[in-house]
Curated annotation (Swiss-Prot):
The keyword Transmembrane does not apply. Monomer. The keyword Acyltransferase does not apply. It comes from the Bacteria. It comes from Shewanella woodyi (strain ATCC 51908 / MS32). This is Outer-membrane lipoprotein carrier protein. Residues 1-22 form the signal peptide. Belongs to the LolA family. Its main location: periplasm. Gene3D superfamilies: Lipoprotein localisation LolA/LolB/LppX. Participates in the translocation of lipoproteins from the inner membrane to the outer membrane. Only forms a complex with a lipoprotein if the residue after the N-terminal Cys is not an aspartate (The Asp acts as a targeting signal to indicate that the lipoprotein should stay in the inner membrane). Keywords: Chaperone, Periplasm, Protein transport, Signal, Transport.
Amino acid sequence: MRKTLTALMLSLPLLTPHMAFADESSVLKAKLTEIATLKAKFEQTVTDINNKQIQKGSGIFALAYPNQFYWHLTAPDESLIVADGTDVWIYNPFAEEVSVMDLNQAISASPIALLVHRDEETWSQYSVTSDNGCFNIKPKSIDAGVESVKVCFDDKTLTEMVLQDQQGNVSQFTLSEQTAIDDAERAMFKFTVPDDVDIDDQRLNAIN
């Protein structure tokens, strides 16, 4: 979801649709490659299939290559998602519960995977088209829980993400105060399990 048309597409109008998708995918990958680390505030709005607002929220979002992700919803209710490069930890303070799963298991079915994965195998699972400064990402598998993801840039800065699920709900995340992450802040990608919480270990190699 970014860039209207690449220079290659403009100069070669007889490109096949398959080649166009491949080119737009490479443009998006190049954009994301320039973002080695990112930390930003976000404002979230969720609407249902009838465009009725069903949720608002705000928090902190961060990512670092490779395979590190941080999502801290601070309002209206707190929740935390941390991908440390190997596992994904999901913490619900209100329920006093932590869920943990393998990174690939957690994000392989979501276009969000492209934010932290750069391997060809992962990228081959999605089609990418561009539209007026944004890139639309759709999984090729009909079993994916997310219908599509739109990511938008202002030059090299990631400014917006829009997720649509298979029920027609749309989550829009507007980013602000984007900065690179310094060495001291990388600790945010390490999750420490709080005392006195239930742990739901869904990792494939978990010992039951």
